């Protein structure tokens, strides 16, 4: 689905306000507690530029969710925007002597890089409260369930940054022509904890192990070894014949040698290139770190007793990727039930018998985008602990007595008690007594019979 928004639609948006900021809902795919919530912040937009910001914010969300692998999981995301006005449009460019009065005090030229667009604390302004502190306050007040924060800076200069080291995913982009690519690349940092795969030296940068960057050249222990064919040499020569394979290519994290990346090229190395298999896998696992594959399950109570032999309905509601379905398998007492692969399952209690039992549903994502999931992120298990105490009644030992009386014995199990009923036509049944079993039986003696040539008897347990 393509979501577009123009200035004429601003008044139709869902909004919520707090002091300086107003929250707008851009995209809803489910409750915030069960979706990944992308929040776009306005930086360098004046009061009369609200419409422009909402358009830019919507484009930022759309651009992110139309890029692989996000597109396949776009139904897992919600989109929001927070508008806060700046006194002036744009952003600081200290090297050229340009300074703007903006709400988050954003600046280019950070840490010696003209395109490194940041907010405080940074090398130009170390005061947390004048940048990231404002972000945190707005999010706490307006969208505490945020998962990915995107700050759109109203400046045409090429620039951006991404940081997840603080525990709060923050992505910053300008509105440059390349902004769509900047957002996707920086999401690799902010959302997937991915490393830059650049090989050019960056003085002072200290490389660390990341999902897509390593110093380990051992095939057996390499973190992305599941993607590497046995025929691929390690390290992998950086020539065109190896462009399509996952291997071990020298150069990553601003290091020419000693550090390796998974593929010859990738979104984390150059714009307008797709994420490689290893980076895409990491992003999918990051998605499942924040949302579970199951939206809901019924019954909501997972510990209960079943007294009746009537079938009991169970169900799960899996999330829905764009082009494939999640798989479902039902288990009883740890054993897979043949053919039980739908989201709904009808349990026949009599097939299990009395006692303690477990019913389990396992919902998993069979995507080919992930080959290694040791933490089981792509799988959700719901377990119901069941105590079956089923009624199993019989009328036995009929014995005729004097004065048209007789005795019956009720045997079996009836945790909820039982009723003895009588009928002359199998249609209308009259209750004669309600009681409970003692030691697995109950002896019933009728009163004197009158006006019946014959009568039928049965015993049932109340539902």
Task: Put a short name on every predicted segment.
Residues 362, 382, 387-463:
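Short, composition-biased motifs enriched in small/polar/acidic residues
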Residues 20-34, 41-46, 58, 62-203:
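Active-site-proximal segment of zinc-dependent metalloprotease catalytic domains
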Residues 35, 311, 325-327, 405, ...:
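Exposed beta-strand and adjacent loop surfaces of beta-rich binding modules
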């Amino acid at each position: 689905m393509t979501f577009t928004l123009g200035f004429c639609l601003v008044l139709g948006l869902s909004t919520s306000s707090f002091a300086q900021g107003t929250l707008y809902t851009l995209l809803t795919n489910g409750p915030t507690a069960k979706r990944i919530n992308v929040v776009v912040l306005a930086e360098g937009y004046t009061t009369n530029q609200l419409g422009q910001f909402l358009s830019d914010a919507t484009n930022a969300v759309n651009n992110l969710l139309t890029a692989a692998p996000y597109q396949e999981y776009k139904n897992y995301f919600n989109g929001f925007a927070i508008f806060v006005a700046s006194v002036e449009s744009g952003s600081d460019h200290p090297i050229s002597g340009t300074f703007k009065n903006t709400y988050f005090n954003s600046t280019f030229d950070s840490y010696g890089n003209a395109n490194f667009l940041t907010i405080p604390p940074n090398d130009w302004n170390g005061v947390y409260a004048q940048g990231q502190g404002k972000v945190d306050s707005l999010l706490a007040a307006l969208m505490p369930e945020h998962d990915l924060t995107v700050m759109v800076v109203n400046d045409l200069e090429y620039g951006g940054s991404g940081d997840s080291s603080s525990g709060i995913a923050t992505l910053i982009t300008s509105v440059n022509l390349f902004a769509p690519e900047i957002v996707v690349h920086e999401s690799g940092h902010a959302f997937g904890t991915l490393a830059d795969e650049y090989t050019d030296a960056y003085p002072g940068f200290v490389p660390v192990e990341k999902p897509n960057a390593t110093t380990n050249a051992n095939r057996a222990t390499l973190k992305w070894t599941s993607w590497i064919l046995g025929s691929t040499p390690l390290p992998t020569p950086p020539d065109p014949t190896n462009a399509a394979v996952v291997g071990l290519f020298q150069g990553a994290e601003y290091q020419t040698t000693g550090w390796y990346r998974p593929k010859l090229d990738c979104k984390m190395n150059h714009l307008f290139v797709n994420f490689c298999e290893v980076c895409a896998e990491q992003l999918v696992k990051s998605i499942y770190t924040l949302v579970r594959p199951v939206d809901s399950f019924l019954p909501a109570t997972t510990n209960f007793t079943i007294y009746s032999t009537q079938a009991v309905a169970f169900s799960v509601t899996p999330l829905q990727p764009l082009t494939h379905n999640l798989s479902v398998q039902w288990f009883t007492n740890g054993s897979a039930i043949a053919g039980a692969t739908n989201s709904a399952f009808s349990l026949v209690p009599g097939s299990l018998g009395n006692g303690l039992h477990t019913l389990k549903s396992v919902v998993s994502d069979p995507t080919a985008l992930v080959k290694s999931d040791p933490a089981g992120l792509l799988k959700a298990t719901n377990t119901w602990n069941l105590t079956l105490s089923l009624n199993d009644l019989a009328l036995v030992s009929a014995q005729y007595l004097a004065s048209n009386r007789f005795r019956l014995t009720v045997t079996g199990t009836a945790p909820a008690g039982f009723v003895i009923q009588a009928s002359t036509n199998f249609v209308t049944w009259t209750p004669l007594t309600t009681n409970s079993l003692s030691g697995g039986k109950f002896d019933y003696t009728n009163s004197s019979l009158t006006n019946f040539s014959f009568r039928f008897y049965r015993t049932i347990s109340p539902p």
